[in-house]
């Protein structure tokens, strides 16, 4: 699956999947074949960080 380039769209997609289908970012990345480091880096570059307890980016 190709991820959106737009940070707001990526934020929305990731948080929807984390809320509805995955118990953690690790599980999402493993299932979708994504690099957790790349996702976290892209989101940090856009000003967002992952909250493990809430299982979402904010």
Residue ranges and their predicted role:
Residues 1-20, 24:
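N-terminal acidic leader/helix
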Residues 28-29:
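Short alpha-helical "recognition helix" segments of helix-turn-helix
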Residues 35-49:
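Short acidic, Pro/Gly- and aromatic-enriched capping/linker segments at domain boundaries
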Residues 52:
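Short, acidic, Ser/Thr-enriched surface-loop or helix-capping motifs
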């Amino acid at each position: 699956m190709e991820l959106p380039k737009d940070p707001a769209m990526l934020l929305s997609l990731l948080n929807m999947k984390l809320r509805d289908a995955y118990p953690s970012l690790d599980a999402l990345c493993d299932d979708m074949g994504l690099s957790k480091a790349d996702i976290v880096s892209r989101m940090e570059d856009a000003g967002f960080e992952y909250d493990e307890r809430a299982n979402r980016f904010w």
